[in-house]
Each structure stands twice: as C-alpha cells, then as structure tokens.
A protein has these predicted regions:
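Short, surface-exposed charged micro-motifs
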Residues: 52, 61, 76, 84-86
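Short acidic-glycine-tyrosine-enriched beta hairpin
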Residues: 65-82
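A generic fold-level signal
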Residues: 14, 27-29, 47, 71, ...
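Conserved short histidine dyad/triad with adjacent acidic residue
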Residues: 31-48
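Glycine- and acidic-residue-biased ligand/ion/polar-headgroup-sensing regions
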Residues: 48-61, 65-66
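A short, N-terminal "cap"/entry segment at the start of jelly-roll beta-barrel domains
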Residues: 1-33, 109-111
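Ligand-binding loop in jelly-roll beta-barrel domains
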Residues: 81-107
Length: 111
C-alpha cells in the first residue's frame, strides 16, 4: 500500500498543531501521522501510548518529564507513556503512537 500526506485527512488539534492522518488502523499496533507545529503544544500525559517524533524539518524545544531537548531535522524523540511532555517550535514531524492514539488516553496538564 502507498500512503501520501497530500491525500491524508487533516485535523486541526489546536491553534498550534495540524495533523495529517497518514496511516491509522485499529487492526495495527501503531498509527502514524504527520504533525505540522506552529507554536506551543502541551503539556500532556498519554496514559496508553508511547509517542515517537521524527523531525522532518524545522526546530523545536521538547520537554519530557522536565528534561529539555532542542530538536532539529533528522532528530528522533521517544516519549514513553505516562510522561509529561510538551513541544514548542515550528516544524514538520512524523508522529508514531504505539498502541494507536486515542483522545481519551491523553490528559492535559496544568503545569
């Protein structure tokens, strides 16, 4: 099968993040989306899924459990389940969630 971001369904998550649903299937152990970030997104805890970010282009500041990383094109970031995380910058990234992302598994953190 061939998947292309130009044909992917688009979702606006908030004022800073747009998601292109590249590959999602309840029968698979993961899902894969393209994220287009333009600002601050977070802080969240995903109770179910590990998240993996592959930075396609741009730069951002990623915070995972109070540890800060500056990321650039070509960087790969793992956010384990139950980790408080946020991302702030301008970039395009491939996001993989395993098991697949469900909105009910993610909680917004006030701090």
């Amino acid at each position: 099968m061939l998947y292309n971001e130009n044909n992917a369904p688009r979702r606006i998550i908030d004022s800073s993040l747009e998601i292109l649903d590249l590959f999602t299937s309840p029968q698979q152990p993961f899902d894969m989306v393209v994220g287009i970030l333009n600002g601050f997104h977070g802080k969240f805890i995903n109770k179910l899924s590990d998240k993996y970010y592959y930075i396609l282009n741009g730069t951002a500041r990623v915070e995972i459990n109070n540890e800060v990383f500056q990321v650039h094109s070509g960087d790969f970031v793992r956010v384990p389940a139950n980790s408080k995380h946020s991302i702030d910058g301008r970039l395009k990234m491939l996001i993989i969630c395993s098991p697949p992302y469900t909105p009910s598994s993610e909680e917004h953190c006030s701090e």
